[in-house]
């Protein structure tokens, strides 16, 4: 079957990597809305228009299921997408519940885009696990821009992260949530600057497992018809070289 994966940019390639591991026999069309990245600092009505334009593009190329591999896009539009389209749709959300469960009676720090943090969906997510008193959040829009610009130099990234994290006493935290798919490119750098006792958690594997279960529940036979083809679009234009660059980076993480 043909699965669409959509993100504001290249962050969702980290989700594609997990999908290739768990659902290797499917065909994938990846859409990076690089003309409009980043979403996390824009007006949500503007972003909603970008999202539906991207999804229509993928529908016109025959997708049978969709992964919204962007926490910001999920928080803004996942409900509207599911009400509009009849095929299986899976979104991303910060992995707050597993982070709370693994925090060992310490606090949880959620890293995301400013728009994700501002949305009611995020507040509801924290409220559902009754964790308002132990969950803090921090927007890191610069990290999205670094990933999009293929900037992974520790001499640039580490000072940025240390500055942004400086208001927090990290000894108080047990888990760090990467609540934006772009942030996974920097997992190794996070590990170098946070205390050893802190676990880093993301929602990628859980999202792909949910996709597989949803496909089976919907009657799809996963791996039965696809050839493992991957097509990558940057705002409507094929860009296979860009895909390869980021997949190569992920092999090293």
UniProtKB/Swiss-Prot annotation:
Q: Where are the membrane-spanning stretches?
A: none
Q: In which pathway does it act?
A: Cell wall biogenesis; peptidoglycan biosynthesis
Database matches in PROSITE patterns: ASP_GLU_RACEMASE_1
Domain of life, per the record? Bacteria
UniProt-listed Enzyme Commission number(s)? 5.1.1.3
- GO molecular function list: glutamate racemase activity
The cross-references to SUPFAM superfamilies, in alphabetical order and at most eight, read: Aspartate/glutamate racemase (SSF53681)
- What the protein does? Provides the (R)-glutamate required for cell wall biosynthesis.
> What's the protein name?
Glutamate racemase
In its UniProt entry, the species of origin is given as Halothermothrix orenii (strain H 168 / OCM 544 / DSM 9562)
Query: What gene codes for this chain?
Result: murI
């Amino acid at each position: 079957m043909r699965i669409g994966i959509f993100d504001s940019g290249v962050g969702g390639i980290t989700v594609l990597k997990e999908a290739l591991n768990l659902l290797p026999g499917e065909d994938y069309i990846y859409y990076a809305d690089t003309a409009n990245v980043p979403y996390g600092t824009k007006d949500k009505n503007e972003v909603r228009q970008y999202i539906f334009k991207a999804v229509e593009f993928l529908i016109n190329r025959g997708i049978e299921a969709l992964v919204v591999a962007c926490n910001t896009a999920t928080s803004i539009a996942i409900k509207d997408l599911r009400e509009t389209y009849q095929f299986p749709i899976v979104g991303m959300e910060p992995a707050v519940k597993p982070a709370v469960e693994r925090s060992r009676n310490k606090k949880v720090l959620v890293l995301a885009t400013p728009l994700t943090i501002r949305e009611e969906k995020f507040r509801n997510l924290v409220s559902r696990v009754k964790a308002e008193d132990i969950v803090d959040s921090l927007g890191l829009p610069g990290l999205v821009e670094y990933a999009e610009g293929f900037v992974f130099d520790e001499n640039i990234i580490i000072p940025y992260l240390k500055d942004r994290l400086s208001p927090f006493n990290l000894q108080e935290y047990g888990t760090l949530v990467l609540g934006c798919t772009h942030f996974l490119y920097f997992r190794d750098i996070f590990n170098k600057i946070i205390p050893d006792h802190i676990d880093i958690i993301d929602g990628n594997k859980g999202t792909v497992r949910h996709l597989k279960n949803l496909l089976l529940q919907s009657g799809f036979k996963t791996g039965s018809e696809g050839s493992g083809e991957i097509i990558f679009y940057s705002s409507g234009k094929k860009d296979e070289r860009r895909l390869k660059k980021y997949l190569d980076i992920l092999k090293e993480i």
